[in-house]
Amino acid sequence: IDNDILKSMRRKVDENGTRNLLENLKNNYPSLALRSTFIVGYPGETRAKFKKLIEFIKDTKFDYAGFFPYSKEPNTASFYMKKHLSNWTKKHRWNKIKKVQNQIALEKAKEMMGQEIEVLVDYFDENTGEYVGHSQKLSPLVDFGVRFVDNGNINCAQIIKVKIYDFDGSDFKGEVL
């Protein structure tokens, strides 16, 4: 989110523009799920700039965020930059920022308890005897799923109403309404 880093990445946005856009989206679309990806350990990323990124993640509270350690790719502007960080530093920062986002994800999962949501049924898991689906906010195969049991009258690609009652760290558990 640091302006110097964004400029060196040749991004056409800056910190203020990004923050204003996100605030506008949150205010105008309160049920919107915010998702993004971030590179950590980019050349020139100081401790202070990394700390600023962590604070941005904490302030924004993305519903879902992915993080990738910077990798030096030939024929890119960053390939020729100075101040490349060590692999240890990149991995350490990657682990640290993932922990921050994981805590945010757990807080958001707790907020889901008791909510009634519409779920698109993706498949029946024969190993567990549960149906698995996702809501509008959940991306299949990437995010948490919603698991539930039914009497067998449900079909894949059907949209059903489910009340969330648990989160096991990888999926929500729900009751068909």
Model feature map: region roles:
Residues Y80-L177:
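Terminal RNA-binding accessory module
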